[in-house]
């Protein structure tokens, strides 16, 4: 079994760092991630592009990949403007290097089906998802994809966002808290400060979330919108969640713009370990 190529520190809201239960939970999480990392890839269906009707005259496109017997499904929200420009053959016009987009197969290898979500059909030009992520229409589009996955797979459905994709994951979960929403969300490299007129995740109505939430952050994330110190505030605002936990990761390499996909912000060099740990956490819920 290969060693996990990342230093993972799971921080739990209910316990202090030296509490025995904290140590047991951390050891269990690492064991689960190591087990997933050592397993062979699951048999899977061929990736396919799916267009689901959502609002009148609008469809939501995503790349769907499922292992032979999925245990859960994850809708993956990329950061940036979110317009992946996915063509019918499954090629990305933009965003192929995004952390979640480039790591999609790792989730499938762990037994999790993925829907790599594009902008909807009425947002296929600039600004794509910019200025749209907190809208009712965005939540309606997500509701349709969640329903499709549940109907096809009969498994729990999660939203996983990275960077600006965390604004989508959190906003959709809040909007659909009354019904039709996800079974849980994962926020990686969360937007914790905003200077473009948008909304930081910590300024959303997180108290309405009654689902599990995992926060994953690199301890050296240099993006000005994502200071690791403010994950404390994020966890405090998730008090209503039945299970709100935080993973702080270290290691890897960083190159380019600190807010881009191959900086620490995008878990460069840590993809396999981080995804395995996320998968283990999701599948344990």
Please annotate each region the language model reported.
Residues 99, 127-152:
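Alpha/beta-hydrolase active-site loop
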Residues 189-248:
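The feature captures the conserved acid-bearing segment of alpha/beta-hydrolase catalytic domains
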Residues 27-37:
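Bacterial N-terminal signal peptides
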């Amino acid at each position: 079994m290969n060693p996990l190529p990342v230093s993972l520190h799971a921080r739990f809201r209910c316990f202090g760092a030296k509490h025995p239960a904290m140590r047991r939970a951390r050891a269990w999480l690492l064991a689960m991630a190591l087990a997933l990392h050592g397993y062979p890839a699951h048999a899977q269906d061929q990736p396919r592009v799916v267009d689901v009707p959502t609002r009148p005259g609008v469809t939501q496109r995503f790349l769907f990949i499922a292992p032979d017997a999925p245990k859960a499904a994850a809708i993956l929200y990329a950061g940036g403007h979110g317009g992946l420009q996915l063509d019918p053959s499954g090629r990305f016009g933009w965003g192929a290097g995004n952390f979640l987009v480039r790591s999609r197969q790792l989730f499938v290898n762990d037994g999790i089906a993925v829907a790599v979500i594009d902008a909807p059909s009425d947002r296929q030009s600039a600004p794509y998802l910019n200025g749209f992520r907190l809208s009712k229409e965005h939540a309606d589009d997500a509701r349709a994809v969640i329903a499709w996955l549940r109907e096809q797979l009969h498994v729990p459905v999660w939203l996983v966002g990275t960077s600006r994709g965390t604004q989508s994951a959190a906003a959709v979960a809040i909007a659909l808290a009354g019904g039709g929403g996800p079974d849980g969300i994962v926020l990686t490299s969360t937007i914790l400060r905003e200077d473009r007129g948008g909304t930081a995740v910590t300024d959303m109505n997180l108290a309405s979330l009654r689902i599990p939430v995992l926060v994953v952050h690199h301890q050296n994330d240099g993006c000005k919108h994502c200071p690791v110190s403010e994950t404390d505030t994020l966890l405090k605002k998730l008090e209503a969640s039945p299970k709100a936990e935080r993973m702080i990761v270290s290691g890897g390499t960083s190159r380019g713009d600190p807010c881009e996909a191959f900086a620490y912000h995008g878990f460069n060099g840590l993809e396999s370990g981080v995804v395995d740990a996320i998968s283990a956490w999701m599948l344990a819920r």
